[in-house]
Amino acid sequence: AVNESDCIEVDGESVVYAKYEYYVMNKPQGVITATEDSRQDTVLDLMEENRRKDLFPVGRLDKDTVGLLLITNDGDLNHRLLSPKKHVDKEYVAKISGRVTEEDVKTFAKGIFIEDGFRALPAELKILSYREKATEEDLLDVEQSNAPQKHLSQGITEISIVIHEGKYHQVKKMFHAIGKEVFFLKRIRMGTLLLDEELAEGTYRKLTADELSGLMRITCKEK
């Protein structure tokens, strides 16, 4: 069972050993989503040194992508969340160089070809705001990303997008396919799990019982 616990003794004191642990992290820019790397800092390097050694991130966020990341040692849940058969929602907010149009919204809703004949599943794209001139924060975001700056003169659109699969660089490739570039990307939801806005970037906490049961509920459904 997922909540199975064993009572063990450490230095003569009884402690509860949980079989599985679940954490939500607000991933910052500049760290990679991996368990270990000899050259770059990983998301697990942000956790306490006495953490369990069998923890791993569920899925991956690019080095310059921020936001919600689930970390656990539950391989079954990891498999179900990432299974193409489950189509678990992933929601992002992003800044796009160039004007995103209602025509783009319709294109994404139909499913867009992004590379090598691969067609992404229909995605829900919403335009949140548009501004003609980049702010200092925008310029900093561009500097910290690998996105080209050629479209900044065409304004900046802030959007939200829900995708139902998790291909490599998928959101960035979807916008690139319509001639626009993502220069800031933040994941705010995975299935029923929402990013805790009280979590500062680079910090984490354990999932609540309600958060965990929500993930179990959506991934245990047959699809």
Placement of each model-derived feature along the sequence:
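Basic, flexible Lys/Arg- and Gly-enriched helix-loop patches that mediate nucleic-acid binding at interfaces
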Residues: 1-223
